[in-house]
Amino acid sequence: MVGYNFAKVRSSSKGGEEIRLSPLELFYKLTHPEIEHPRPSQLVVLEKWYAAYQSSINDNIVSLNTGAGKTLVGLLMAETLRREKGGKVLYVCPNNLLGKQTLDESKRYGLDVASYLNLDGNGAAWSKEDKYLANESVCITNYDAVLNSLSKFESHEIVGVIFDDAHIALELLDKQYTFSIENAELIKQIAMLFKDSPSIGYKIESLLQNDPQSLTMVPLSEWHDAHEEVKRLIIKSKAHKESGAFAWKFLQENLLHCLCFMGAGKIEISPLYPKSKSHYVFSKKIQRVYLSATVPNLGDITRVFGVTPKRIESESPDYRADRLFLFSKKIGLSNPDEFIRKSLSELKEKVFGIVPNKLSLLTYKTLGITVAEDSVAALEKILEFKSDKIQKLVLSNRYDGIDLPGAVCHILVIDGLPWQGDLKTRFFSEYFHNENNAFLRAIIAAKLVQAFGRTVRSADDYSIILLLDKRLNNWLLNRDNDKFFKKDIV
């Protein structure tokens, strides 16, 4: 890995005051003789972003392909903001694992950063907190630490935030304003309020029987009549004190303007538009950069974040990654998916798989393949997989936030169309039909692009991608969906 020595980029004046440099000027302070120029895509986005920043455009979404040096670009932007604005800057990662990877990369670049991460499983802890508080270092942290209702960063004078894998922030912020109920008795009490509903009354019985297919949204007119009683039941049960305290703090006075979704063993209440402007990260006039290998739907960003960012992209990729896509339906067997799954369990090579939900994990578990059913177990198993302690690993709904470069893994399995676990997205997905709705098709494509990048992390990397499940095969082979992908994929 190339070394950068940002520590030497200081003026010769007394006190060692830092020189204000553009991100490209910082880039050229290389200590490794083999690296003389940024990649074309890095050059383009850094120039475009710096011009937007100097024009006082506060929100910018920057898209770079997997393996194009997105992390370095983000760190250069963060360092530029810290130096020019003289304040605190956060570089926010999806999870602790990617936070650790970013921390390691920043050190190799010669960038002296602080961090607030949970690296040992014993809770989040500071590294170089004093340098961060003195505005001398960017802080690397994760989304949970920044977006939760008790964030320690809220009282800080933040001048800039870099959101890595920004689409994850969309989901997490939406979740912050969603009140979830899993108490069986409370679910029954609320559901029974609508047992005589002409619109959804017939669904209540299957819902209370925990039918996995049961899913509905309370009609707005009926929610208008029942929301006060729902509020009374929630307060009486004290469910608002058990979990979702932040969401309830906002929702309790705004229930009338919320949507209520009911599914097997769960009820979710959320506004159509999260009150993101009340969140300290989005309420202040600061620099926000949204990094992503895919360009999230700008309408969704506006809905969730309450901002309309400037789109910054490179016109063409630096390379076309070597990916071999194999479609199970093209094999010509009567049951190709079952054949491939069984063959994978017998394969000597390492294999990483992604399925849409926990139920789908059971198929692989019965074949003796390692699976992880929750986020804590997933992080543990990913580390074991990277260190070759296990050869096969399948996770549910983990289309992003995992880097498996080079020899770590060259075989990726995607088994099933991406599926989002929250009731709201599930409801709209089913109501509008995935295959026909442009908005939902864009979401599916974005998740698949993220998945394709798990095992291809650089220009000299390669991957075999096995695509299982009839619906997934048909969706990808439908040429009408090509427009939702970048040219380097289709």
Question: Where are these predicted regions, by residue range?
Answer:
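Conserved pre-motif I regulatory segment
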Residues: 8-63
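Pre-Walker A (Motif I) flank of P-loop NTPase domains
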Residues: 54-62, 87-88, 137, 286-287, ...
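Conserved RecA-like P-loop NTPase helicase motor core
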Residues: 384-474
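Short, low-complexity, polybasic intrinsically disordered segments
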Residues: 231-239, 475-490
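Inter-Walker segment of RecA-like/P-loop motor cores
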Residues: 97-101, 106-157, 379-384
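Conserved helicase motor "Helicase C" RecA-like lobe of SF1/SF2 P-loop NTPases
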Residues: 356-375
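Conserved coupling segment at the C-terminus of the helicase ATP-binding
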Residues: 27, 31, 43-44, 50, ...
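Conserved Walker A/P-loop ATP-binding site and its immediately adjacent core
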Residues: 71-120, 144-145, 294-300, 354-361
